[in-house]
């Protein structure tokens, strides 16, 4: 099933993938302006899922989270942590690796988006409008220090990934 929410969010995945590719077309060059657009877009996308989509589905399940929600939240934590330090080749590679797995969990048949659409039912148009109107998250400057990198590595490991950053 590919309903309205699935199309909207999967389309946003494609937009974000394109931005990340444009931000780093080769390992030696990172376009800071394009990466900043990617970063803001990914934070907004995560916010939409965490603040609008997943709560709407949880409400329809009588307060119980989707079975996939715990894994997706761990991925969101890892991705958000990877957006704190300045982008480097290993950081961008880690973001790409996580998104490959994460987006599949959301987009595939029976995935999170399909489950949410089935649960939300008649509320889809209202939820979609709320998603479209969701604001961008205020981005802060990158932070580059050993504490941030340690926290980022822990977030990646908690999400179940073995990636070097």
List each model region and its residues:
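Small-residue-biased structural context
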Residues: 1-165
């Amino acid at each position: 099933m590919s309903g309205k929410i699935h199309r909207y969010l999967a389309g946003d995945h494609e937009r974000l993938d394109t931005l990340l590719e444009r931000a780093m077309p080769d390992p030696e060059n990172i376009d800071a302006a394009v990466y900043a657009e990617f970063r803001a877009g990914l934070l907004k996308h995560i916010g939409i899922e965490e603040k609008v989509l997943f709560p709407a589905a949880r409400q329809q399940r009588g307060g119980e989270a989707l079975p996939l929600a715990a894994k997706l939240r761990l991925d969101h934590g890892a991705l958000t942590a990877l957006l704190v330090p300045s982008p480097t080749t290993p950081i961008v590679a880690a973001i790409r690796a996580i998104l490959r797995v994460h987006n599949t969990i959301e987009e595939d048949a029976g995935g999170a988006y399909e489950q949410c659409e089935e649960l939300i039912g008649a509320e889809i148009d209202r939820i979609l409008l709320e998603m479209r109107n969701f604001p961008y998250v205020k981005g802060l400057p990158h932070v580059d220090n050993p504490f941030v990198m340690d926290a980022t590595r822990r977030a990646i490991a908690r999400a179940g990934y073995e990636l070097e950053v």
